[in-house]
C-alpha cells in the first residue's frame, strides 16, 4: 500500500486534491446514472472538467480529449434528459439498428482521431516542429495503445447514455474494467480506485435498468 501511494511523491498537493474531488463527483455521477437520475450530468460535468485539467497536466491527451468530449456530451445529455424526465427520472429503451450504425461510426472516428493525436505526439511536444524528431507507431507507449481503445469505448458509451439506451452499461463495464490497471500504471491511484468502483456500479446499473425494462414501461424510481 505504501508503494502505491509512493506514486504521489513529488506531485503538487493541489493536483492530488483535485484528483480526489474529481473522483468524488465522478462517483456521484455514476451512482445517479445507475438510478436514471438527471443529476448524473451536473455532477459529471464537474468531474470531467477537473480531469481535463489534470490529464492535460500529465500529458495524457487521449484521456483528456475523452473528458472534454464527456463535458460537451454531458451538456447535450442534460438538455435531452430534461426534455424527457419526470421528477428528475428518465425512461430508458434498447438500442436500435440505426443506433448501432451511429455507434460504429463514433467508434471508428474515435480510433482514428486519438491514434492520429498520439502519432503526432513527438511533433506536438516539439512545439509543432519536425526538427530532430521522427514520427511512427514505434513511439507509442503500451498505455497509449490501450488509451486509444478505451477512448472509443467510452465515447460510444456516453452517446448511448445520452440517448437513454440500456446497452450503454455494457460499454461502461468493459471500459471501466480496463481502466483500473491502466490508471494504476499511469500513477493515478485514486483514479484507478474510482474506475474499480465504476465497474461495480456499472454492473449494478445494467441489472437495475434491465429489471426496469422487463417489469414495467414506467420511469425508473429514485
Where is each model-derived feature located?
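Long, highly hydrophobic alpha-helical transmembrane signal-anchor segments
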Residues: 27-55
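Hydrophobic residues within alpha-helical transmembrane segments
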Residues: 42, 46, 68, 174-177, ...
